[in-house]
Every structure is written in structure tokens, then in C-alpha cells.
Design a protein with these regions (language model features):
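Sec-dependent, cleavable N-terminal signal peptides
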Residues: 1-24
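Aromatic (Trp/Tyr/Phe) and Gly/Pro-enriched flexible surface segments
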Residues: 24-297, 301
Length: 301
């Protein structure tokens, strides 16, 4: 074997190494929630009164970070991640222990409790801010992921998350008359582990629990990505056992008025098995309303 042939395998490894590194989800935890909202999440809007878990969002928090997943299976290239555990636990592959962070805080949220049918909520990550829409709609793109898939599909208790919008013209059942924007596409059904999954109840669940939330729950399998239950060696896979496809949260709003959004996620029933929300960078936007600037010309007799 000549020297050129001997060098070939080493050269291939050198070339392949950056590709392998780029294929994995990258999560950073160096910015405050306020910085992440303003610099990463928002697209052309300005946030005010940014609060995380009831306090000014001016400290770096392990439950909030930035991510780059251009070559992973999240489906969103980059953005903000919010988790019931340490956001670093999202990094795959998904072929080892569960992402299962037990946090020292006991944060809860009444709207998540309502979504979880009165179950206790812990390890909550609650990010709230105000904004003024520049158009008559507001929208953003997201993916929900959880370690509770597939075992706890159709279980009596599931981790909960929601996007609670309040402000002029909004009337809903949550705090400050908010509505939840985290809905199964084309429906008014909240996105949960029991409404978006593979269509099969887990061994800790019963199909009746899923059917009680949505009689057509099995049809929602089209919005689910199976991540192979801790048995996926693919380096592009995130660590959670299942995740949704990319979805869009949207609402009608009044241009120029002040609105509040609360992005919240929490562990239900216990503090085990992390869940997370991936929010697309720059997608939180309110397209400006078109103005017809054409002047009417006087008619000529």
C-alpha cells in the first residue's frame, strides 16, 4: 500500500469530522431570556416587560437557551428553546438515558394546571412579555418535544404547555381572559401528548383518555415524529422520544394595541421526564397592514 492510500482514511476522517459535528443539535445557554426574546424570537417587533417565572428576565437560566438545528430532526433551523429541565439535555442522539432534570425550583402556573385537568405542575418555565402588533395578526412557528412519548401517551397525566395570548378583543378561559394558541392544526384542540402522537396508547395509558380530549386523536398522527424511544443512534436526532412536526400558532389582533403572551411549559404530576418547546427564530411577527397610498384623481368632464 503506498503512502497516498495510507493517508486516505485519515483524510476522510478529517473531512467527515466537521460534518458529524454540524449534524448534531447545538444548544447554547449564554443569554438571558430577555435577550433571547428580543434578539432571537421576535421578527420586527419590540418586547417590553419581559418576565421569566415571575421575575425580570435578566439572568441566564438553564431552562431557556438558543439552539441551532439546521441538520437535526427538529425541523426548525434555529431559535429559542424552553424546557422543563436543562436545555442542554435536548442534545442527542436519543440512544441513552432519559432527559430527566430535577430542578430545585417548584414553579407552577395556574393555566398549565387548568390544561392538565387540575394535576400538580412543577419545573415550570414561564416566559411572558408584552408587544404591540404592527398588523392584524400575530403568529410564530414551534415544535413540541417530550420524553413522555410513547409510554405515557393516553395516560391520565401529561406534561403541559401553552401559548396564552391576552389583550384587546381576546376572550378565553385562562388568566386575563387569555386564549391558548398551541392548537392542533385546523382545530381548537390543544396540542398535548394525548392529542398528537403515533395514534397508539402507551403502556401507561388507555385510549379512552385520548378520545376524551379529541375523538379524532389518531388522525393527528400526521403531526407526530417518532424518535424511537431512547433507541435512536442517529446523531441528527434530538434526545426526546417524540416531537411534533413544525406547527404555527396564530391569532387575530388589533394593530397598535398592547398584547401579552405567556409561553409556558411544565411537568405534570411529577418532576420527571423533560419536555421542551422549540420556537423558530424571527418567526414571532405581525405583518404590517398594507396601506393604499394611491390618491384619487379628479374626474375630467
Amino acid at each position: 500500500m503506498n503512502n497516498a492510500m495510507k493517508r486516505t482514511p485519515a483524510l476522510l476522517l478529517i473531512i467527515a469530522a466537521p460534518l458529524l459535528a454540524c449534524a448534531q443539535l447545538v444548544v447554547t445557554n449564554t443569554q438571558t431570556p430577555a435577550q433571547l426574546v428580543q434578539n432571537t424570537l421576535l421578527g420586527g417587533l419590540v418586547a417590553t416587560n419581559i418576565i421569566f417565572n415571575g421575575a425580570p428576565a435578566t439572568a441566564v437560566i438553564t431552562q431557556v437557551g438558543a439552539f441551532n438545528s439546521a441538520n437535526s430532526n427538529v425541523g426548525i433551523a434555529s431559535g429559542l428553546i424552553l424546557s422543563t429541565g436543562n436545555v442542554a439535555s435536548a442534545i442527542g442522539p436519543n440512544n441513552g438515558a432519559f432527559a430527566n432534570t430535577i430542578l430545585p425550583n417548584n414553579t407552577t402556573d395556574p393555566d398549565l394546571v387548568l390544561l392538565a385537568n387540575g394535576q400538580n405542575i412543577g419545573d415550570a418555565a414561564v416566559l411572558r412579555f408584552n408587544f404591540i402588533p404592527t398588523g392584524n395578526t400575530v403568529s410564530f412557528r414551534f415544535v413540541f418535544a417530550s420524553e413522555e412519548y410513547p409510554v405515557y401517551v393516553c395516560a391520565a397525566v401529561n406534561d403541559a404547555f401553552g401559548f396564552f395570548l391576552s389583550g384587546p378583543g381576546i376572550s378565553g378561559p385562562y388568566q386575563n381572559n387569555a386564549v391558548n394558541l398551541a392548537l392542533v392544526p385546523g382545530t381548537g384542540t390543544p396540542v398535548t401528548i394525548n392529542t398528537v402522537n403515533s395514534g397508539t396508547a402507551g403502556n401507561q395509558g388507555a385510549a379512552a383518555n385520548c378520545a376524551a380530549l379529541d375523538p379524532n386523536w389518531q388522525a393527528n398522527a400526521q403531526f407526530f415524529v417518532n424518535n424511537m424511544d431512547n433507541n435512536n443512534p442517529d446523531p441528527t436526532a434530538v434526545r426526546y422520544n417524540g416531537l411534533t412536526t413544525v406547527m404555527t400558532a396564530t391569532a387575530q389582533v388589533q394593530c397598535g394595541q398592547v398584547y401579552s403572551i405567556k409561553i409556558a411549559i411544565g411537568d405534570a404530576g411529577d418532576d420527571e421526564y423533560d419536555s421542551a418547546i422549540f420556537l423558530e427564530a424571527g418567526s414571532f411577527s405581525s405583518p404590517s397592514m398594507a396601506v393604499d397610498a394611491t390618491a384619487a384623481l379628479p374626474s375630467v368632464a
